[in-house]
Amino acid sequence: MCMEAEPPSPPAQQQEQVNPPLCKAQNPKPARLYRLVLLFVAGSLAAWTFHALSSTNLVWKLRQLHHLPTAHYLQTRDEFALYSVEELNAFKEFYDKSVSDSVGASYTEAEQTNIKEALGALRMAQDLYLAGKDDKAARLFEHALALAPRHPEVLLRYGEFLEHNQRNIVLADQYYFQALTISPSNSEALANRQRTADVVQSLDERRLESLDSKRDALSAIHESNGALRRAKKEAYFQHIYHSVGIEGNTMTLAQTRSILETRMAVDGKSIDEHNEILGMDLAMKYINASLVQKIDITIKDILELHRRVLGHVDPIEGGEFRRNQVYVGGHIPPGPGDLALLMQRFERWLNSEHSSTLHPVNYAALAHYKLVHIHPFVDGNGRTSRLLMNTLLMRAGYPPVIIPKQQRSKYYHFLKLANEGDIRPFVRFIADCTEKTLDLYLWATSDLPQQIPMLIQTESEAGERLAQMQSPNVAQRSSILEFYESGSGDIP
Protein backbone atom coordinates (compact mmCIF):
# COMPACT_ATOMS: atom_id res chain seq x y z
CA MET A 1 0.00 0.00 0.00
CA CYS A 2 1.30 3.46 -0.84
CA MET A 3 1.82 6.02 1.89
CA GLU A 4 0.31 9.50 1.49
CA ALA A 5 2.65 12.49 1.32
CA GLU A 6 2.98 14.48 4.51
CA PRO A 7 1.51 18.03 4.39
CA PRO A 8 4.15 20.66 3.74
CA SER A 9 5.54 22.63 6.66
CA PRO A 10 4.62 26.31 6.80
CA PRO A 11 8.02 27.55 5.55
CA ALA A 12 7.79 25.30 2.54
CA GLN A 13 4.56 27.01 1.48
CA GLN A 14 6.70 29.82 0.07
CA GLN A 15 8.66 27.33 -2.04
CA GLU A 16 7.56 25.58 -5.25
CA GLN A 17 5.25 22.76 -4.47
CA VAL A 18 6.18 19.41 -5.95
CA ASN A 19 3.83 16.63 -7.03
CA PRO A 20 3.31 13.95 -4.44
CA PRO A 21 5.18 10.69 -5.16
CA LEU A 22 3.25 7.97 -7.09
CA CYS A 23 3.10 4.43 -5.91
CA LYS A 24 4.21 1.54 -8.20
CA ALA A 25 0.65 0.55 -8.95
CA GLN A 26 -0.18 4.05 -10.11
CA ASN A 27 2.67 4.21 -12.71
CA PRO A 28 1.46 2.52 -16.00
CA LYS A 29 4.58 3.14 -18.11
CA PRO A 30 6.55 -0.10 -17.45
CA ALA A 31 3.49 -2.35 -17.98
CA ARG A 32 2.47 -0.53 -21.15
CA LEU A 33 5.99 -0.73 -22.53
CA TYR A 34 6.12 -4.43 -21.75
CA ARG A 35 2.86 -5.04 -23.62
CA LEU A 36 4.09 -3.05 -26.63
CA VAL A 37 7.31 -5.06 -26.78
CA LEU A 38 5.39 -8.34 -26.60
CA LEU A 39 3.00 -7.16 -29.32
CA PHE A 40 5.89 -6.13 -31.57
CA VAL A 41 7.70 -9.46 -31.10
CA ALA A 42 4.52 -11.48 -31.73
CA GLY A 43 3.69 -9.45 -34.83
CA SER A 44 7.20 -9.85 -36.18
CA LEU A 45 7.12 -13.61 -35.66
CA ALA A 46 3.71 -13.89 -37.32
CA ALA A 47 4.81 -11.82 -40.31
CA TRP A 48 8.02 -13.82 -40.72
CA THR A 49 6.14 -17.14 -40.48
CA PHE A 50 3.54 -16.03 -43.06
CA HIS A 51 6.25 -14.82 -45.42
CA ALA A 52 8.24 -18.03 -45.07
CA LEU A 53 5.23 -20.24 -45.69
CA SER A 54 4.08 -18.15 -48.64
CA SER A 55 7.53 -18.11 -50.17
CA THR A 56 7.96 -21.84 -49.71
CA ASN A 57 4.59 -22.54 -51.30
CA LEU A 58 5.31 -20.21 -54.21
CA VAL A 59 8.75 -21.67 -54.82
CA TRP A 60 7.28 -25.17 -54.72
CA LYS A 61 4.63 -24.21 -57.23
CA LEU A 62 7.18 -22.56 -59.45
CA ARG A 63 9.29 -25.71 -59.40
CA GLN A 64 6.26 -27.44 -60.84
CA LEU A 65 5.38 -24.63 -63.22
CA HIS A 66 8.76 -24.59 -64.88
CA HIS A 67 8.03 -28.04 -66.32
CA LEU A 68 5.04 -26.74 -68.29
CA PRO A 69 5.44 -26.15 -72.02
CA THR A 70 5.84 -22.75 -73.69
CA ALA A 71 5.54 -24.06 -77.21
CA HIS A 72 4.41 -22.21 -80.31
CA TYR A 73 2.40 -25.22 -81.43
CA LEU A 74 -0.46 -24.50 -79.01
CA GLN A 75 -1.38 -21.10 -77.71
CA THR A 76 -0.07 -20.05 -74.33
CA ARG A 77 -3.47 -19.83 -72.72
CA ASP A 78 -4.09 -23.48 -73.64
CA GLU A 79 -0.82 -24.71 -72.22
CA PHE A 80 -1.06 -22.76 -68.96
CA ALA A 81 -4.76 -23.11 -68.35
CA LEU A 82 -4.11 -25.10 -65.18
CA TYR A 83 -2.75 -22.01 -63.40
CA SER A 84 -3.96 -18.53 -62.49
CA VAL A 85 -2.72 -15.28 -64.02
CA GLU A 86 -0.81 -14.40 -60.84
CA GLU A 87 0.97 -17.75 -60.88
CA LEU A 88 1.84 -17.34 -64.54
CA ASN A 89 3.36 -13.90 -63.93
CA ALA A 90 5.35 -15.33 -61.04
CA PHE A 91 6.36 -18.24 -63.24
CA LYS A 92 7.62 -15.94 -65.98
CA GLU A 93 9.84 -14.00 -63.58
CA PHE A 94 11.12 -17.19 -61.95
CA TYR A 95 11.66 -18.97 -65.25
CA ASP A 96 13.55 -16.08 -66.85
CA LYS A 97 15.82 -15.87 -63.81
CA SER A 98 16.31 -19.62 -63.43
CA VAL A 99 17.18 -20.02 -67.10
CA SER A 100 19.70 -17.18 -67.04
CA ASP A 101 21.20 -18.57 -63.85
CA SER A 102 21.49 -22.05 -65.32
CA VAL A 103 23.42 -20.77 -68.33
CA GLY A 104 26.15 -19.44 -66.10
CA ALA A 105 26.00 -22.26 -63.60
CA SER A 106 29.13 -24.19 -62.87
CA TYR A 107 29.46 -27.67 -64.33
CA THR A 108 30.88 -30.77 -62.73
CA GLU A 109 34.23 -31.98 -63.92
CA ALA A 110 32.61 -34.76 -65.95
CA GLU A 111 30.19 -32.32 -67.56
CA GLN A 112 33.02 -29.95 -68.42
CA THR A 113 34.90 -32.81 -70.05
CA ASN A 114 31.83 -33.80 -72.07
CA ILE A 115 31.20 -30.22 -73.16
CA LYS A 116 34.82 -29.77 -74.20
CA GLU A 117 34.68 -32.97 -76.25
CA ALA A 118 31.29 -32.01 -77.70
CA LEU A 119 32.52 -28.61 -78.85
CA GLY A 120 35.56 -30.26 -80.41
CA ALA A 121 33.32 -32.71 -82.26
CA LEU A 122 31.10 -29.81 -83.28
CA ARG A 123 34.00 -27.94 -84.89
CA MET A 124 35.09 -31.07 -86.74
CA ALA A 125 31.52 -31.68 -87.91
CA GLN A 126 31.28 -28.15 -89.30
CA ASP A 127 34.60 -28.56 -91.12
CA LEU A 128 33.46 -31.85 -92.64
CA TYR A 129 30.16 -30.29 -93.67
CA LEU A 130 31.96 -27.45 -95.45
CA ALA A 131 34.17 -30.05 -97.14
CA GLY A 132 31.08 -31.82 -98.47
CA LYS A 133 31.43 -34.93 -96.28
CA ASP A 134 27.85 -34.86 -95.05
CA ASP A 135 27.61 -38.41 -93.68
CA LYS A 136 30.66 -38.06 -91.45
CA ALA A 137 29.50 -34.59 -90.41
CA ALA A 138 26.09 -35.97 -89.42
CA ARG A 139 27.66 -38.64 -87.20
CA LEU A 140 29.85 -36.06 -85.46
CA PHE A 141 26.90 -33.70 -84.94
CA GLU A 142 24.98 -36.56 -83.34
CA HIS A 143 28.00 -37.42 -81.18
CA ALA A 144 28.26 -33.82 -79.99
CA LEU A 145 24.55 -33.78 -79.17
CA ALA A 146 24.83 -37.01 -77.19
CA LEU A 147 27.69 -35.54 -75.13
CA ALA A 148 26.04 -32.17 -74.47
CA PRO A 149 22.30 -32.44 -75.17
CA ARG A 150 21.51 -29.12 -73.48
CA HIS A 151 24.35 -26.95 -74.73
CA PRO A 152 22.93 -24.02 -76.77
CA GLU A 153 25.78 -23.97 -79.29
CA VAL A 154 25.46 -27.69 -80.02
CA LEU A 155 21.69 -27.43 -80.41
CA LEU A 156 21.98 -24.37 -82.64
CA ARG A 157 24.62 -25.75 -85.03
CA TYR A 158 23.03 -29.17 -85.30
CA GLY A 159 19.69 -27.50 -86.04
CA GLU A 160 21.28 -25.46 -88.83
CA PHE A 161 22.80 -28.63 -90.28
CA LEU A 162 19.42 -30.37 -90.22
CA GLU A 163 17.68 -27.39 -91.78
CA HIS A 164 20.10 -26.69 -94.62
CA ASN A 165 21.57 -30.12 -95.34
CA GLN A 166 18.93 -32.62 -94.29
CA ARG A 167 15.97 -30.38 -95.15
CA ASN A 168 14.39 -31.34 -91.83
CA ILE A 169 13.03 -27.96 -90.83
CA VAL A 170 10.69 -29.41 -88.19
CA LEU A 171 13.48 -31.05 -86.20
CA ALA A 172 15.73 -28.03 -86.77
CA ASP A 173 13.06 -25.75 -85.30
CA GLN A 174 12.81 -28.08 -82.32
CA TYR A 175 16.52 -27.68 -81.59
CA TYR A 176 16.35 -23.89 -82.04
CA PHE A 177 13.51 -23.88 -79.53
CA GLN A 178 15.53 -25.92 -77.04
CA ALA A 179 18.49 -23.58 -77.46
CA LEU A 180 16.25 -20.62 -76.63
CA THR A 181 14.83 -22.45 -73.63
CA ILE A 182 18.35 -22.68 -72.23
CA SER A 183 19.65 -19.34 -73.53
CA PRO A 184 16.70 -16.98 -74.22
CA SER A 185 18.93 -14.13 -75.42
CA ASN A 186 20.74 -16.19 -78.07
CA SER A 187 20.38 -13.90 -81.09
CA GLU A 188 21.19 -16.58 -83.69
CA ALA A 189 18.63 -18.99 -82.29
CA LEU A 190 16.06 -16.18 -82.21
CA ALA A 191 16.75 -15.31 -85.83
CA ASN A 192 16.53 -18.96 -86.86
CA ARG A 193 13.22 -19.44 -85.07
CA GLN A 194 11.77 -16.33 -86.68
CA ARG A 195 12.57 -17.94 -90.00
CA THR A 196 11.28 -21.44 -89.20
CA ALA A 197 8.41 -21.07 -86.72
CA ASP A 198 5.67 -20.09 -89.17
CA VAL A 199 6.79 -22.66 -91.73
CA VAL A 200 6.73 -25.43 -89.13
CA GLN A 201 3.34 -24.36 -87.84
CA SER A 202 2.00 -24.49 -91.39
CA LEU A 203 3.42 -27.99 -91.85
CA ASP A 204 1.85 -29.12 -88.59
CA GLU A 205 -1.53 -27.74 -89.62
CA ARG A 206 -1.34 -29.48 -92.99
CA ARG A 207 -0.50 -32.72 -91.19
CA LEU A 208 -3.62 -32.38 -89.07
CA GLU A 209 -5.73 -31.72 -92.16
CA SER A 210 -4.37 -34.95 -93.63
CA LEU A 211 -5.43 -36.82 -90.49
CA ASP A 212 -8.92 -35.36 -90.78
CA SER A 213 -9.13 -36.62 -94.37
CA LYS A 214 -8.19 -40.16 -93.31
CA ARG A 215 -10.65 -40.00 -90.42
CA ASP A 216 -13.42 -38.94 -92.83
CA ALA A 217 -12.52 -41.79 -95.18
CA LEU A 218 -12.78 -44.25 -92.30
CA SER A 219 -16.06 -42.72 -91.13
CA ALA A 220 -17.52 -43.27 -94.59
CA ILE A 221 -17.22 -47.05 -94.15
CA HIS A 222 -20.50 -48.48 -92.91
CA GLU A 223 -20.56 -50.05 -89.45
CA SER A 224 -21.89 -53.28 -90.91
CA ASN A 225 -18.70 -53.78 -92.93
CA GLY A 226 -17.29 -57.13 -91.81
CA ALA A 227 -13.69 -56.08 -92.36
CA LEU A 228 -14.24 -53.00 -90.21
CA ARG A 229 -15.68 -55.09 -87.40
CA ARG A 230 -12.70 -57.45 -87.53
CA ALA A 231 -10.32 -54.49 -87.60
CA LYS A 232 -11.96 -52.98 -84.52
CA LYS A 233 -11.70 -56.27 -82.66
CA GLU A 234 -8.04 -56.69 -83.54
CA ALA A 235 -7.26 -53.06 -82.69
CA TYR A 236 -8.95 -53.59 -79.32
CA PHE A 237 -6.55 -56.41 -78.47
CA GLN A 238 -3.57 -54.44 -79.77
CA HIS A 239 -4.51 -51.35 -77.79
CA ILE A 240 -4.59 -53.25 -74.50
CA TYR A 241 -1.45 -55.23 -75.37
CA HIS A 242 0.58 -52.11 -76.11
CA SER A 243 -0.74 -49.93 -73.30
CA VAL A 244 0.13 -52.45 -70.59
CA GLY A 245 3.34 -53.31 -72.44
CA ILE A 246 4.52 -49.70 -72.20
CA GLU A 247 4.30 -50.10 -68.41
CA GLY A 248 6.39 -53.28 -68.46
CA ASN A 249 3.82 -56.06 -68.88
CA THR A 250 5.52 -59.03 -70.58
CA MET A 251 2.45 -60.71 -72.08
CA THR A 252 2.58 -61.35 -75.83
CA LEU A 253 -0.21 -60.23 -78.13
CA ALA A 254 -1.41 -63.83 -78.48
CA GLN A 255 -1.45 -64.27 -74.69
CA THR A 256 -3.29 -60.98 -74.25
CA ARG A 257 -5.91 -62.03 -76.78
CA SER A 258 -6.28 -65.42 -75.09
CA ILE A 259 -6.86 -63.88 -71.66
CA LEU A 260 -9.50 -61.50 -73.01
CA GLU A 261 -11.31 -64.15 -75.04
CA THR A 262 -11.15 -67.14 -72.69
CA ARG A 263 -10.56 -65.53 -69.26
CA MET A 264 -8.08 -68.35 -68.67
CA ALA A 265 -4.73 -67.80 -66.96
CA VAL A 266 -1.46 -68.05 -68.86
CA ASP A 267 1.21 -70.28 -67.34
CA GLY A 268 4.39 -68.59 -66.20
CA LYS A 269 2.92 -65.10 -65.90
CA SER A 270 2.19 -63.19 -62.70
CA ILE A 271 -1.29 -62.49 -61.37
CA ASP A 272 -0.64 -58.74 -61.63
CA GLU A 273 0.11 -59.01 -65.34
CA HIS A 274 -3.19 -60.83 -65.86
CA ASN A 275 -5.04 -58.25 -63.78
CA GLU A 276 -3.50 -55.32 -65.65
CA ILE A 277 -5.00 -56.68 -68.87
CA LEU A 278 -8.40 -57.28 -67.26
CA GLY A 279 -8.35 -53.78 -65.77
CA MET A 280 -7.73 -52.19 -69.17
CA ASP A 281 -10.55 -54.29 -70.59
CA LEU A 282 -12.95 -52.96 -67.94
CA ALA A 283 -11.83 -49.37 -68.52
CA MET A 284 -12.26 -49.55 -72.30
CA LYS A 285 -15.73 -51.05 -71.93
CA TYR A 286 -16.60 -48.19 -69.57
CA ILE A 287 -15.42 -45.68 -72.19
CA ASN A 288 -17.45 -47.32 -74.96
CA ALA A 289 -20.58 -47.59 -72.82
CA SER A 290 -20.47 -44.22 -71.08
CA LEU A 291 -17.72 -41.66 -71.59
CA VAL A 292 -17.84 -41.41 -75.38
CA GLN A 293 -21.44 -40.22 -75.22
CA LYS A 294 -20.85 -37.64 -72.47
CA ILE A 295 -20.60 -33.94 -73.26
CA ASP A 296 -18.29 -33.08 -70.36
CA ILE A 297 -15.60 -35.19 -68.72
CA THR A 298 -15.49 -34.70 -64.96
CA ILE A 299 -13.07 -35.59 -62.19
CA LYS A 300 -15.50 -38.32 -61.17
CA ASP A 301 -15.28 -39.81 -64.67
CA ILE A 302 -11.48 -39.85 -64.50
CA LEU A 303 -11.61 -41.49 -61.06
CA GLU A 304 -14.05 -44.10 -62.36
CA LEU A 305 -11.74 -44.76 -65.28
CA HIS A 306 -8.79 -45.21 -62.94
CA ARG A 307 -10.82 -47.38 -60.57
CA ARG A 308 -11.30 -49.85 -63.41
CA VAL A 309 -7.68 -49.65 -64.57
CA LEU A 310 -6.39 -50.52 -61.11
CA GLY A 311 -9.45 -52.39 -59.85
CA HIS A 312 -7.98 -55.88 -60.16
CA VAL A 313 -4.38 -54.92 -59.31
CA ASP A 314 -4.89 -52.57 -56.35
CA PRO A 315 -8.59 -52.03 -55.51
CA ILE A 316 -7.73 -49.89 -52.48
CA GLU A 317 -5.86 -47.28 -54.54
CA GLY A 318 -8.11 -47.59 -57.59
CA GLY A 319 -10.18 -44.45 -58.09
CA GLU A 320 -8.39 -42.55 -55.30
CA PHE A 321 -5.94 -39.66 -55.44
CA ARG A 322 -2.54 -40.54 -54.04
CA ARG A 323 -1.76 -39.53 -50.47
CA ASN A 324 2.03 -39.52 -50.77
CA GLN A 325 4.67 -37.74 -52.80
CA VAL A 326 5.89 -39.66 -55.84
CA TYR A 327 8.92 -39.22 -58.09
CA VAL A 328 8.94 -39.96 -61.81
CA GLY A 329 12.46 -39.90 -63.16
CA GLY A 330 13.58 -36.29 -63.21
CA HIS A 331 10.03 -35.02 -62.79
CA ILE A 332 8.68 -34.28 -59.30
CA PRO A 333 4.86 -34.21 -59.53
CA PRO A 334 2.80 -31.92 -57.28
CA GLY A 335 2.34 -32.92 -53.67
CA PRO A 336 -0.82 -34.72 -52.56
CA GLY A 337 -2.18 -31.59 -50.89
CA ASP A 338 -2.39 -29.78 -54.24
CA LEU A 339 -4.02 -32.54 -56.27
CA ALA A 340 -7.64 -31.57 -55.60
CA LEU A 341 -7.08 -27.99 -56.75
CA LEU A 342 -5.01 -28.97 -59.78
CA MET A 343 -7.56 -31.56 -60.88
CA GLN A 344 -10.37 -29.00 -60.54
CA ARG A 345 -8.43 -26.65 -62.80
CA PHE A 346 -7.74 -29.50 -65.20
CA GLU A 347 -11.45 -30.33 -65.29
CA ARG A 348 -12.31 -26.69 -66.08
CA TRP A 349 -9.75 -26.62 -68.88
CA LEU A 350 -10.92 -29.98 -70.22
CA ASN A 351 -14.48 -28.71 -70.61
CA SER A 352 -13.75 -25.08 -71.47
CA GLU A 353 -15.19 -23.50 -74.59
CA HIS A 354 -11.77 -22.66 -75.95
CA SER A 355 -10.42 -26.20 -75.52
CA SER A 356 -13.26 -27.43 -77.71
CA THR A 357 -11.93 -25.25 -80.55
CA LEU A 358 -8.57 -27.05 -80.60
CA HIS A 359 -7.93 -29.71 -83.19
CA PRO A 360 -8.89 -33.08 -81.67
CA VAL A 361 -5.34 -34.43 -81.87
CA ASN A 362 -3.92 -31.30 -80.20
CA TYR A 363 -6.64 -31.40 -77.57
CA ALA A 364 -6.23 -35.11 -76.80
CA ALA A 365 -2.42 -34.98 -76.71
CA LEU A 366 -2.42 -31.96 -74.42
CA ALA A 367 -5.00 -33.55 -72.11
CA HIS A 368 -2.81 -36.66 -71.94
CA TYR A 369 0.22 -34.57 -71.04
CA LYS A 370 -1.53 -32.41 -68.45
CA LEU A 371 -2.95 -35.41 -66.61
CA VAL A 372 0.26 -37.42 -66.61
CA HIS A 373 2.14 -34.28 -65.51
CA ILE A 374 -0.13 -33.85 -62.47
CA HIS A 375 0.30 -37.59 -61.83
CA PRO A 376 -2.67 -37.79 -59.46
CA PHE A 377 -2.49 -41.52 -58.73
CA VAL A 378 -0.05 -43.88 -57.06
CA ASP A 379 -0.08 -46.14 -60.12
CA GLY A 380 -1.84 -46.30 -63.47
CA ASN A 381 -1.30 -42.65 -64.46
CA GLY A 382 0.03 -43.48 -67.92
CA ARG A 383 -2.73 -45.96 -68.74
CA THR A 384 -5.42 -43.58 -67.48
CA SER A 385 -3.94 -40.66 -69.43
CA ARG A 386 -3.84 -42.70 -72.64
CA LEU A 387 -7.43 -43.83 -72.08
CA LEU A 388 -8.53 -40.23 -71.55
CA MET A 389 -6.70 -39.21 -74.72
CA ASN A 390 -8.49 -41.91 -76.69
CA THR A 391 -11.84 -40.95 -75.20
CA LEU A 392 -11.40 -37.43 -76.56
CA LEU A 393 -10.27 -38.74 -79.94
CA MET A 394 -13.20 -41.15 -80.18
CA ARG A 395 -15.64 -38.33 -79.45
CA ALA A 396 -14.16 -36.55 -82.49
CA GLY A 397 -14.62 -39.57 -84.76
CA TYR A 398 -11.10 -40.99 -84.52
CA PRO A 399 -10.40 -44.60 -83.54
CA PRO A 400 -8.53 -45.33 -80.29
CA VAL A 401 -4.88 -44.60 -81.02
CA ILE A 402 -2.35 -47.37 -80.54
CA ILE A 403 1.02 -46.28 -79.12
CA PRO A 404 3.30 -49.25 -79.86
CA LYS A 405 5.22 -50.50 -76.86
CA GLN A 406 8.29 -50.71 -79.12
CA GLN A 407 8.10 -46.90 -79.24
CA ARG A 408 8.21 -46.68 -75.44
CA SER A 409 11.55 -44.88 -75.30
CA LYS A 410 10.40 -42.26 -77.81
CA TYR A 411 7.12 -41.85 -75.95
CA TYR A 412 8.90 -41.06 -72.69
CA HIS A 413 11.52 -38.95 -74.46
CA PHE A 414 8.84 -36.70 -75.94
CA LEU A 415 7.13 -36.40 -72.56
CA LYS A 416 10.49 -35.34 -71.14
CA LEU A 417 10.86 -32.71 -73.88
CA ALA A 418 7.41 -31.42 -72.95
CA ASN A 419 8.53 -31.12 -69.33
CA GLU A 420 11.54 -29.15 -70.52
CA GLY A 421 9.42 -26.66 -72.42
CA ASP A 422 8.40 -27.93 -75.87
CA ILE A 423 5.25 -30.01 -76.18
CA ARG A 424 5.23 -29.99 -79.99
CA PRO A 425 7.34 -33.17 -80.41
CA PHE A 426 4.91 -35.05 -78.16
CA VAL A 427 1.91 -33.79 -80.13
CA ARG A 428 3.60 -34.81 -83.38
CA PHE A 429 4.33 -38.24 -81.94
CA ILE A 430 0.65 -38.67 -81.07
CA ALA A 431 -0.23 -37.47 -84.58
CA ASP A 432 2.13 -40.11 -86.02
CA CYS A 433 0.50 -42.84 -83.95
CA THR A 434 -2.94 -41.56 -84.95
CA GLU A 435 -2.04 -41.76 -88.62
CA LYS A 436 -0.63 -45.28 -88.32
CA THR A 437 -3.76 -46.41 -86.49
CA LEU A 438 -5.94 -44.90 -89.22
CA ASP A 439 -3.79 -46.61 -91.84
CA LEU A 440 -4.29 -49.90 -90.02
CA TYR A 441 -8.09 -49.55 -90.30
CA LEU A 442 -8.02 -48.30 -93.89
CA TRP A 443 -5.69 -51.10 -94.94
CA ALA A 444 -7.91 -53.69 -93.30
CA THR A 445 -11.07 -52.38 -94.99
CA SER A 446 -9.57 -51.84 -98.44
CA ASP A 447 -9.55 -54.19 -101.44
CA LEU A 448 -6.15 -55.45 -100.34
CA PRO A 449 -5.88 -58.91 -98.72
CA GLN A 450 -8.39 -58.91 -95.90
CA GLN A 451 -6.08 -60.32 -93.25
CA ILE A 452 -5.63 -57.72 -90.55
CA PRO A 453 -1.98 -56.87 -89.75
CA MET A 454 -0.88 -58.50 -86.53
CA LEU A 455 2.01 -57.56 -84.36
CA ILE A 456 4.65 -60.05 -85.39
CA GLN A 457 6.78 -61.38 -82.57
CA THR A 458 9.91 -62.20 -84.59
CA GLU A 459 11.63 -60.92 -87.71
CA SER A 460 11.23 -64.29 -89.46
CA GLU A 461 7.46 -64.19 -88.93
CA ALA A 462 7.41 -60.65 -90.29
CA GLY A 463 9.29 -61.77 -93.40
CA GLU A 464 6.88 -64.64 -93.97
CA ARG A 465 3.89 -62.33 -93.58
CA LEU A 466 5.26 -59.77 -96.02
CA ALA A 467 6.06 -62.51 -98.54
CA GLN A 468 2.38 -63.47 -98.55
CA MET A 469 1.27 -59.99 -99.53
CA GLN A 470 0.63 -59.89 -103.28
CA SER A 471 -0.32 -56.31 -104.13
CA PRO A 472 1.13 -53.10 -105.66
CA ASN A 473 0.86 -51.55 -102.17
CA VAL A 474 3.34 -53.87 -100.46
CA ALA A 475 5.65 -50.96 -99.64
CA GLN A 476 2.87 -49.07 -97.89
CA ARG A 477 1.80 -52.10 -95.85
CA SER A 478 5.43 -52.81 -95.03
CA SER A 479 5.74 -49.31 -93.60
CA ILE A 480 2.67 -49.83 -91.42
CA LEU A 481 3.85 -53.20 -90.17
CA GLU A 482 7.35 -51.94 -89.50
CA PHE A 483 5.96 -49.21 -87.28
CA TYR A 484 4.20 -51.73 -85.06
CA GLU A 485 6.75 -54.52 -85.19
CA SER A 486 10.31 -53.29 -85.15
CA GLY A 487 10.20 -50.24 -82.90
CA SER A 488 13.56 -49.23 -84.40
CA GLY A 489 14.44 -46.06 -86.25
CA ASP A 490 12.14 -43.14 -86.96
CA ILE A 491 8.45 -43.51 -87.51
CA PRO A 492 8.05 -44.29 -91.23
From Swiss-Prot:
Disulphide linkage map: none
Record's GO cellular component terms: plasma membrane
EC number(s) from the headed UniProt entry: 2.7.7.108, 3.1.4.-
Membrane topology: Single-pass membrane protein
Activity regulation info: The side chain of Glu-247 determines which of the two opposing activities (AMPylase or de-AMPylase) will take place. In response to endoplasmic reticulum stress, mediates de-AMPylase activity. Adenylyltransferase activity is inhibited by the inhibitory helix present at the N-terminus: Glu-247 binds ATP and competes with ATP-binding at Arg-386, thereby preventing adenylyltransferase activity. In unstressed cells, disengagement of Glu-247 promotes adenylyltransferase activity.
Active site residues of this protein: 375
Domain Fido as annotated: residue spans: 297-432
GO molecular function: AMPylase activity; ATP binding; Hsp70 protein binding; protein adenylylhydrolase activity; protein homodimerization activity
Segments of this protein annotated with the region Disordered: 1-21
InterPro entries, sorted: Fido, Fido-like_dom_sf, Fido_containing, TPR-like_helical_dom_sf
UniProt key word Cell membrane: no
Motif Inhibitory (S/T)XXXE(G/N) motif, residue range(s) on this chain: 243-248
TPR repeat spans: 118-151, 152-186
Biological process per Gene Ontology, one example term: visual behavior
Superkingdom: Eukaryota
Residues given in the record as ATP binding sites: 247, 328-331, 379-386, 411-412, 419
Family matches, as Pfam families: Fic (PF02661)
Bias (Low complexity): 1-17
Ranges annotated as spanning the membrane: 33-55
Reactions that this protein is recorded to catalyse: L-tyrosyl-[protein] + ATP = O-(5'-adenylyl)-L-tyrosyl-[protein] + diphosphate; L-threonyl-[protein] + ATP = 3-O-(5'-adenylyl)-L-threonyl-[protein] + diphosphate; 3-O-(5'-adenylyl)-L-threonyl-[protein] + H2O = L-threonyl-[protein] + AMP + H(+)
Family as reported in the entry's similarity comment: Belongs to the fic family.
Function text: Protein that can both mediate the addition of adenosine 5'-monophosphate (AMP) to specific residues of target proteins (AMPylation), and the removal of the same modification from target proteins (de-AMPylation), depending on the context. The side chain of Glu-247 determines which of the two opposing activities (AMPylase or de-AMPylase) will take place. Acts as a key regulator of the unfolded protein response (UPR) by mediating AMPylation or de-AMPylation of Hsc70-3/BiP.
Domain description: The fido domain mediates the adenylyltransferase activity.
Subunit (UniProt): Homodimer.
Name of this chain's protein: Protein adenylyltransferase Fic
Source organism of the structure: Drosophila simulans (Fruit fly)
